[in-house]
């Protein structure tokens, strides 16, 4: 029997100086990516369910400030009332962000993640599954690529 985790998904487009950017995510693409997430996490008997999906008002933030993952996640999560769901923010691609998203179990006011758009369902879903791993307190797996046994782990979700 698998455990179900309810998600509240916000499709959050960006704006810069009042000029909105086209949304990359939609509730339909979120559902497609979540199918990839659930295929990955099914091995651990964990299923994620979108309880609610909403198109959020654009977040007006300069492009140069978007790659500060902690700050961005705090700004995103402070825009909404905390509840008993896991909040997921799906955002457009972010220039110079070194990761696919960010997650903080101790984010203010609640545990939350954001995932940037990669342009295809498999990459979007894998990045989302990775961030959910962080919300379940999983750390990155450090790999020594010179070690053949460790290098074989490069496809591990948490690398």
Residue ranges, per PLM feature:
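Extracellular structured ligand-interaction cores
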Residues: 4-6, 83-85, 155
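The catalytic-center signature of Zn2+-dependent metalloproteases
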Residues: 115-159
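Fold-level signature of zinc-dependent metallopeptidase catalytic domains
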Residues: 1-41, 46, 57, 93-95
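Extracytoplasmic/secreted cell-surface and envelope-processing proteins
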Residues: 19, 97-100, 126-127, 136
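Glycine-rich, flexible loop segments associated with nucleotide phosphate handling
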Residues: 23-32, 79, 149-156
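Active-site-proximal segments of metallohydrolase catalytic domains
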Residues: 44-114, 118
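Active-site-proximal beta-strand/loop segments in catalytic clefts of secreted hydrolases
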Residues: 10-15, 51-53, 89-94, 117-120, ...
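Intrinsically disordered, low-complexity boundary segments flanking structured domains
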Residues: 33-38, 70-78, 99-105, 138-149
